[in-house]
From Swiss-Prot:
Family recorded in the similarity comment: Belongs to the RecF family.
Keywords of the record: ATP-binding, Cytoplasm, DNA damage, DNA repair, DNA replication, DNA-binding, Nucleotide-binding, SOS response
One GO CC term, this protein: cytoplasm
Domain of life: Bacteria
Chief localisation class: cytoplasm
Listed name of the protein: DNA replication and repair protein RecF
HAMAP family: RecF
Disulfide cross-links: none
Example of a GO biological process term: SOS response
Subcellular location, record wording: Cytoplasm
Task of the protein: The RecF protein is involved in DNA metabolism; it is required for DNA replication and normal SOS inducibility. RecF binds preferentially to single-stranded, linear DNA. It also seems to bind ATP.
One Pfam match: SMC_N
Originating species: Xanthomonas oryzae pv. oryzae (strain MAFF 311018)
Length: 362
């Protein structure tokens, strides 16, 4: 898929701006604070329902405005015969939102997020590797959400059961009142875990070749999965039953896929905690690119790739390796930087350039 038009209104420095990206490589340059990242934020907001720099109400809306608006028009479909044009709009006040997709009102942000797929690498992406388990769970679930149509319903089923069980635990409910939700949590949780495990196994097969190209010195060799309970010993139903007294005392559910995690393993390093910040960024980028390649294989089209401030996040050598990998694929890319990243010349990439200044994009 590739974005043909992106319109932004009342978002950070932008009062009104519109750009028409090329279908391949797009570079947005400008001084620090000019608004380059805000363009990617707008696209990310439509694809994820949130900014990668915080909540909508935490500074994303232009000062003095009541809300922001983003409109995206894009083509999707893996072949000319199957291509179609799609349009989505989102108005967000930080508290309330309204959205439209292909001329119809949408009741859930998930409908917009399911339509437009964007893989974003930005200065905070290292938390995928160096942070806690939540971003890694989101990473898995994003991939499943976009390649398995029924995954969202399964995920919502599990989350609903978890919320209900936790509410009962906080109320000090009697054990028999937990039985129905334990059954629902165990049934949906086992299925959710199986999906995540299969996806991670598939992703590992894509990740290792990507990592070998863009960061061979890391020696990334495997991904391991921790399901959130001792699955090799007991079923989730049994784990919930065994932990019931402790959960009632603590007021929350201690076992299940909401506590799952995964970890990269390296031939030359003892583990993710031994990574420098730069190595964590490279590992995160390799994971994101592997996820994009998996999306392309499963959906027969590439997601949009957004790379924020690539020149300062990676040195010239690694920039060239990343871009050389990407320019060989029919993916639309939007890259920001204060200047043309040196690695672009090394990768031999043709680009469409935009300049961002004083709240305008030229």
């Amino acid at each position: 898929m590739h974005v043909m038009r992106l319109s932004i209104h009342r978002l950070r420095r932008f009062q009104t701006v519109e750009l028409h990206p090329a279908s391949a490589l797009n570079l947005l340059t400008g001084d620090n604070g000019a608004g380059k990242t805000s363009v990617l934020e707008a696209l990310h907001l439509m694809a994820y329902g949130r900014s990668f720099r915080g909540r909508v109400r935490d500074g994303l809306i232009q000062q003095g405005a009541n809300d922001l608006e983003v409109f995206v028009e894009w083509k999707e479909g893996g072949s000319a015969a199957g291509e179609r044009t799609r349009r989505a709009g989102l108005r967000h006040s930080g508290q309330e939102w309204t959205g439209r997709l292909d001329g119809e009102d949408v009741a859930q942000l998930g409908s917009l997020c399911a339509a437009l797929a964007v893989v974003t690498f930005e200065p905070g992406s290292h938390v995928l590797i160096s942070g806690g388990g939540e971003p890694r769970r989101r990473f898995l679930d994003w991939g499943l959400f976009h390649v398995e149509p029924d995954f969202l319903a399964l995920w919502r089923r599990y989350v609903r059961a978890l919320k209900q069980r936790n509410a009962l635990l906080k109320q000090g409910a009697q054990p028999r009142m937990l039985d129905a939700w334990d059954h629902e949590l165990a049934e949906s949780g086992e299925t959710l875990t199986s999906r995540r495990m299969r996806y991670l196994e598939r992703l590992q097969d894509r990740l290792i070749p990507v990592a070998d190209v863009i960061a061979p010195s890391l020696g990334l060799s495997a991904l391991t999965f921790a399901p959130g309970w001792k699955r090799h010993e007991v079923s989730l139903a049994d784990a919930l039953l065994l932990a019931r007294d402790r959960d009632r005392q603590n007021g929350y559910t201690s076992q299940g896929p909401h506590r799952a995690d995964w970890m990269p393993h390296f031939d030359v390093l003892p583990g993710k905690d031994a990574l420098s910040r730069g190595q964590a960024k490279l590992t995160a980028l390799a994971c994101l690119l592997a996820q994009a390649e998996d999306f392309a294989f499963e959906r027969s089209e590439w997601p949009v790739i957004a790379l924020d401030d690539l020149g300062s996040e990676l040195d010239r050598h690694h920039q060239a390796r990343v871009l050389h990998r990407l320019v060989s694929a029919p993916a639309q890319m939007l890259i920001t930087g204060t200047e043309i990243p040196p690695g672009l010349a090394d990768a031999g990439a043709l680009l469409h350039r935009f300049h961002v200044e004083h709240g305008q994009v030229d």
